[in-house]
């Protein structure tokens, strides 16, 4: 969704985000009590501290818009908290704030992180090293994906967060991993749809292959919940 279209649809997205016109009980609850939740969670103070640390460490190295907003980091935490996965797959660490935010949900969860520049990123290390071996680092995306799915038990739903996609090779690897989830069951969160063409293309592929479940997006972040119990619906929202 381009900037002009986001502005043009702002009122309708804001209206829908209040629950108006949403008939699915699951979707209404998810929009109102997860995406739109305004009461603070226990991890919010830690998330704010991580973001402040990343901002200070990065200094003028990155444009301000490249650092995840505090609201989005909190939303990622709430989404993860709602589904409470025991195994998480995160593609791209950026500053490390998003990865730390989803890992903060459970001290028992294991996060499989594909971040080819982790060894050179002091801020990623600063934020993620305190989690110890509960964050497993990979510099090869295929190895990361394979290791993640080998740890998923038969009845567990995959949970995937994609922060960025570096090139066509990574896109192909993610298609092979993610599209089967879309056709079965699991949760996929894609960020930076408005900034990165490859992320937008993967999001379009996910929506195209979805036969059931629900998608939620504001044109910047997309959330796909693949669940055969849910009728296929697409919601354009004003996400916090």
Residues covered by each model-derived region:
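A short alpha-helical cap/connector motif
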Residues: 1-159, 165-184, 193-240
């Amino acid at each position: 969704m381009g900037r002009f279209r986001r502005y043009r649809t702002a009122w309708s997205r804001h209206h829908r985000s209040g629950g108006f016109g949403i008939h699915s009980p699951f979707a209404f609850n998810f929009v109102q009590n997860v995406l739109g939740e305004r009461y603070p969670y226990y991890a919010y103070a830690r998330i704010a501290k991580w973001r402040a640390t990343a901002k200070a460490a990065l200094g003028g190295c990155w444009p301000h818009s490249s650092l995840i907003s505090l609201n989005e980091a909190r939303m990622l935490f709430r989404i993860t908290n709602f589904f409470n996965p025991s195994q998480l797959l995160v593609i791209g660490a950026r500053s490390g704030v998003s990865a730390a935010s989803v890992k903060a949900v459970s001290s028992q969860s294991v996060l499989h992180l594909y971040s080819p520049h982790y060894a050179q990123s002091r801020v990623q290390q600063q934020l993620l090293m305190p989690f110890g071996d509960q964050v497993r680092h990979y510099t090869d995306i295929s190895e990361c994906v394979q290791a993640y799915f080998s740890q998923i038990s038969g009845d567990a739903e995959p949970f995937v967060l994609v922060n960025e996609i570096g090139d066509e090779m990574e896109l192909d690897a993610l298609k092979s991993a993610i599209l089967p989830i879309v056709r079965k069951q699991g949760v996929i969160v894609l960020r930076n749809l408005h900034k990165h063409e490859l992320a937008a293309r993967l999001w379009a592929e996910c929506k195209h292959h979805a036969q059931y479940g629900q998608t939620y997006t504001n044109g910047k972040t997309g959330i796909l919940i693949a669940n055969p119990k849910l009728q296929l619906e697409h919601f354009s929202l004003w996400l916090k």
